[in-house]
Amino acid sequence: MITLKNVSKWYGHFQVLTDCSTEVKKGEVVVVCGPSGSGKSTLIKTVNGLEPVQQGEITVDGIVVNDKKTDLAKLRSRVGMVFQHFELFPHLSIIENLTLAQVKVLKRDKAPAREKALKLLERVGLSAHANKFPAQLSGGQQQRVAIARALCMDPIAMLFDEPTSALDPEMINEVLDVMVELANEGMTMMVVTHEMGFARKVANRVIFMDEGKIVEDSPKDAFFDDPKSDRAKDFLAKILH
């Protein structure tokens, strides 16, 4: 479903990704973790072309992402992305946030787009807030709206870039619960997160990054119970204290 082969990226002379290779199979949940500045967010943003790469190849469902001929807008309509800071349109109501891309990109009629939006708002527990604006919702509610908005596009995979790191602690679980439900339903997911409880619960594999390299890429039990690298052992000791 998602394949990265020998992916490298530079910002000027600074190399942010070095020879990164991995694969996410259909229905797999892969958690990407590592210290700040390790390249996690950059890696996940290369998957749908938000971050261009200078070397290597990225394919999603057979489409080569970094081929100049690839229609990235079309690809992004099929790969949902949820960001750290929600990225909702502040001037649109919640229901409008959920219907806009369905109508503009997927060319859905307004009535079925609205029906789909309401169904997904109900799924994330927010149907009562359809006519409110983002600023009227808590951070946790806004992030659940962002997940529902991505799901409105019927994505083949979902990418999450630190979806809980901007939230107050008491709001984190309401977002993670939605993500756990998605994982249990078989959604293909790549998740950049420090939430190791979530990783233990639903990840098939864990990728550990440091200094732009994939240091470990292993089944979750192997990663948590028997990490191979000293860097991963050190990271887990700090984060699981």
From Swiss-Prot:
Topological type in the membrane: Peripheral membrane protein
Cellular compartments annotated: Cell inner membrane
InterPro entries: AAA+_ATPase, ABC_ATPase_HisP-typ, ABC_transporter-like_ATP-bd, ABC_transporter-like_CS, MetN_ABC_transporter-like, P-loop_NTPase
Enzyme superclass (EC): translocase
Sections of the chain in a coiled coil: none
Domain (ABC transporter): residue spans on this chain: 2-236
Catalyzed reactions per annotation: a polar amino acid(out) + ATP + H2O = a polar amino acid(in) + ADP + phosphate + H(+); L-glutamate(out) + ATP + H2O = L-glutamate(in) + ADP + phosphate + H(+); L-aspartate(out) + ATP + H2O = L-aspartate(in) + ADP + phosphate + H(+)
Residues annotated to bind ATP: 34-41
A Pfam family recorded for this sequence: ABC_tran
Keywords attached to this entry: Amino-acid transport, ATP-binding, Cell inner membrane, Cell membrane, Membrane, Nucleotide-binding, Translocase, Transport
GO molecular function, one term: ATP binding
PROSITE patterns: ABC_TRANSPORTER_1, ABC_TRANSPORTER_2
Gene3D superfamilies according to UniProt: P-loop containing nucleotide triphosphate hydrolases
Subunit (UniProt): The complex is composed of two ATP-binding proteins (GltL), two transmembrane proteins (GltJ and GltK) and a solute-binding protein (GltI).
Membership in a protein family: Belongs to the ABC transporter superfamily.
Protein name: Glutamate/aspartate import ATP-binding protein GltL
Originating species: Escherichia coli (strain K12)
